Amino acid sequence: METLNLIKNDSWLEAYADAINGRHQHALNKESELTNKGKQTLSDFATGYLYFGLHRTSKGWIFREWAPNATEIYLVGTFNDWTEKKEYSLNRLNNGNWEITLPDNALKHGDLYKLMIHWESGCGERIPAWATRVVQDEKTRIFSAQVWTPQNPYKMKRKAFEPTTTPLLIYECHIGMAQQEEKVGSYKEFREKTLPRIVKAGYNCIQFMALQEHPYYGSFGYHVSNFFAASSRYGTPDELKELIDTAHGLGISVIMDIVHSHAIKNEIEGLGNFAGDPNQYFYPGPRHEHPAWDSLCFDYGKNEVMHFLLSNCKYWLEEYQLDGFRFDGVTSMLYYSHGLGENFSDYSDYYNGHQDDNAICYLTLANKLVHEVNPKAITIAEEVSGMPGLATKIEDGGYGFDYRMAMNIPDFWIKTITDHIDEDWKPSSMFWEVTNRRKDEKTISYTESHDQALVGDKTIIFRLIDADMYWHMQKGDESYIVHRGIALHKMIRLLTATTINGGYLNFMGNEFGHPEWIDFPREGNGWSYKYARRQWDLVDNEKLTYHYMGDFDADMLKLIKGINDFQNTDIQEIWHNDSDQVLVYMRKDYIFVFNFNPKKSFTDYGFLVTPGTYETILNTDNPIYGGYGLTDDKVKHFTISDELYKKEKKEWLKLYIPARTGVVLRKTN
C-alpha cells in the first residue's frame, strides 16, 4: 500500500501508520458497503428523509418510521382526537420499518401529530424521528410534530451560491438572542434587522447556532431532540429559507452548528428509548450516556444510525440550501473518554486504541457526502485534542474537514489576560500560539466565541475593563482601564485576524466589545431574557466608546479582504523582543507591527525589511478608533540602506511605535 500523504508530510506519524491506514481503509470499506460496492453514490444512500417521515403523494399521504422493537404503531393527533384508531395504524414492513398511507382528507396543513408506539413491555407517545416541523404548545408546553404543507411555500431564488473563502470571515450567531429586546428573536427579525449589520461589519459567512429543534432554550441548542426540524421558536421553515436566500443575495454564506456528537435524553420529544429500545440509536452499556453532558451517545457502528445522520447532513444542504456545517463536539466523538481528563501531550494519545473508529468513519463519510452534494460546501470541526489529519483530505489519509477551530488561541488570550500583568505579556509566545498549526490543515482563528461569553465566563473586553464598563464608557469620561481595554481589544483581534491561514470567527456583538455574559432564561435568574439578547444600541450610540471597536473591526476585515488570497500568503516573523514587548511580521507587501509595552513608546525602532517606501494603512491608535493619535499616519516611511545587509537585500525601517499600539504598513513601490 502506498504511503498516505498524511504520513509523508509528518515523519512522526510513521510509527502509527498501521492505525492511520486502518482508519482510512475502514472508511473506504464502509462506503463500499453503504453504496453497494459503488453501484450508487453516498449521496444516493443519504436520502432517508425522502423515504421516512410524512410526505404528500398524488393520492394523499404516506408516513414511514424505523422502529424495529415496536409491536404496534398508531398515528395520533388533532385529526383523530389523539386516539388510537385502526385507520391510523401503521403496517410493519421489512427491516423494522413501518408504513401507513392515508387519503388526502385525513390530514391538513397545521395538524399536530405524534406516534403512539407499543412494544412488548409497554407503550408511549413519541415524536417521529424524521419529523421536519416540531412545535410547542404555548399553554401546555407540550411538543408535537406538525404537518407543514403551506399553500404557497417559499421557493428559494438562488440554487447555486458559491461561498467566499478568501478568506472565510464567520459571524457566529444565535437567532433567538440576536435582537435588542428581552425576548426570543425570530428568523424574520434577523433577516430585517441583524443581517444588514453583518453586511456592514464586513463578514462573509454566518454560522447559526441552535437551528436544530431543542426543547430547552437554555441549552444553547446543543441538546437536540429533532434533528430534521428547524427550531420553531424562531418562526417557520419558510421564514428560515427566506433568511438564507436573502443572505445569499447579499453575498453571505450560511452554515450551521450541526450536533451529531450526542442527543437529548428525552423520550417523548427525542430519540431516547424510542420504541422501548434505549439502544435503537445509541450505544449500549457504559458508552450509552455521556458522562458530562447528561445526554445519549450515537452508535456510529450501526448502518441505520449512519443512514440517519448522513441523511440529516444532506437534508439541511438540500432543503435549506445551507453552505455547510460546523460539527459540534468532535473531540467527544473521537474518543471513548470523550476527551475528558486527557492531556493529549503525545502522538500516541491519538493511536492507543482508545479512539472510536466508528465515529471517525462516520465523520470521514460525512465530509465526503457533504462535498459530494456540494463541492463548494464548508465543513469545520470543533476539536480540542489536536487529532492529526482531521482537516486533511480524505485521499491523503485525513478525515476531510475543510477547517478545524483553532481552539488554542482563545485559551491563550484568556490565560494571558488573567495570569499575567501587562509587563509580562510576551510577543514571542503570542506569535507562536496564533501560528501553531499543522502545515496540512487550515484553521479558523478566533479570539473568542460564544463559549467565552457564557454565564460564569467572561468576554475579553469584560476581562480587560470589568466594572468600568458600567461607569466609564461615555466619551470624555473614559478611565485609564477603559483606554487600556479598548487598546488591547483591538490589538488582540488584529494579531489574531492577520495571522490566519484559513478563516476568522467572531461571536455576534464581540466585535464592538459587547458587555456582560450570556445567561439564558432559567429558574435561577427568574426566567429573564436580560442577558440573552444583544444590546445593539451601545454600538449605535456615538456618545459611547463601543463603536470605536466596531469601526476598527470593520476596517480590519476590509484590509484583510483587500489583499488577494490573504489567508494563503506566507507569514514571516521579522522581529520580536520580549523585553521591549515588540512583535513584527510580514505577509506579502504588508508589515504588521505591535508594541504591547504598557509604558514605553519607542522612537526610531528599527527592523530589517524589503527595501522601499511604506505607508500606514491601519493603526489601532487612530483617534477614529478611540486611540490617542500619537503618530501621523500620512507620513511615508523610507527604508535606510546598510552595507551589512545588502547581500540579503534588506534595509532598515525605523518607526515611532507608541505603547499599546498595532500598526499595519504597506509597501508602495
Regions found by a protein language model. Give the residues of each.
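Substrate-binding/active-site clefts of carbohydrate-active enzymes
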Residues: 135, 153, 157-165, 170, ...
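The feature marks proteins involved in alpha-glucan
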Residues: 1-62, 83-85, 89-172, 177-182, ...
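C-terminal beta-strand-rich structural cap/linker in extracellular carbohydrate-active enzymes
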Residues: 109-113, 588, 633-669
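Conserved alpha/beta catalytic core and glycan-binding cleft of carbohydrate-active enzymes
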Residues: 321-323, 341-529, 561-606, 613, ...
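Conserved, mostly hydrophobic/aromatic
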Residues: 65, 115, 173, 198, ...
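Aromatic- and carboxylate-lined catalytic core of secreted/periplasmic carbohydrate-active enzymes
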Residues: 367-368, 374-375, 534-573, 659-664
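Surface-exposed beta-strand/loop patches in extracellular or lumenal glycoproteins
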Residues: 63-67, 73, 77, 597-613
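Surface-exposed acidic, glycine/proline-enriched linker/cap segments
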Residues: 289-295, 300, 353, 628-652
